[in-house]
Amino acid sequence: YGTKSEAEIAGRVPALLGRLVERFNPCIAVIACNTASTIALAAVRSALALPVVGTVPAIKPAALASRSRVIGVLGTDATVRQPYVDRLSADFASDCVVLRHGSAELVDAAEAL
């Protein structure tokens, strides 16, 4: 999803998960993608009648563990520019400097593994 537009992700993820839930009837759904979670998690939670867990940048545990109070977030371009990441930083790392680096190459690297 790192190379898709936000509009594509916002439309595709809830629709896709809705179809999967109808087909498989799970007890819980996990969005195991930072980009999809930071863009579509709220919409998916509103649309589905089951718990939905998202995977988002681990800013909270990083802030708890940091001694330098400087946190680096490496993600896709779409992930690092999301307001969701702004809120995580404000809520859990307001006393830290949160450096963000977005890279389209992460998608290629992950898919090459």
Residue ranges of each PLM-predicted region?
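Non-catalytic structural scaffold of enzyme domains
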Residues: 1-113
